[in-house]
């Protein structure tokens, strides 16, 4: 399950941001997850809940925003937003499409609490 390595990298990135901002803890992690990212949201959530226990994210809530697939048809120039995993143009049924969005996983926002002086 590659979600474990993804969550490990995500938590490491969160820790770097917390350190740079002198945060004592992270309370919320917002990510955007593309439908074509190859990451299963429920497995990602489970992995996050497991890995967060020993670090600065131990009280953090993970919010996952699913990013639909956005494609551009090379034949009819139609741009389409799709909620399923297909690269077929819904306008002309062409397979000659280019993915514009929906393949990535991005850290969008962190909510942190500052260290007290």
Curated annotation (Swiss-Prot):
Organism: Shewanella baltica (strain OS223)
Binding site for Zn(2+): 73, 76, 89, 92
Name of the protein: Hydrogenase maturation factor HypA
Pfam families registered for this protein in UniProt: HypA (PF01155)
Taxonomic superkingdom: Bacteria
GO molecular function, one term: zinc ion binding
Keywords: Metal-binding, Nickel, Zinc
Keyword Metal-binding: yes
PANTHER family: HYDROGENASE MATURATION FACTOR HYPA
List of residues binding Ni(2+): 2
Function according to Swiss-Prot or TrEMBL: Involved in the maturation of [NiFe] hydrogenases. Required for nickel insertion into the metal center of the hydrogenase.
Gene: hypA
Entry's transmembrane regions: none
GO biological process, one term: protein maturation
InterPro entries: HypA/HybF (IPR000688)
Family that this chain belongs to: Belongs to the HypA/HybF family.
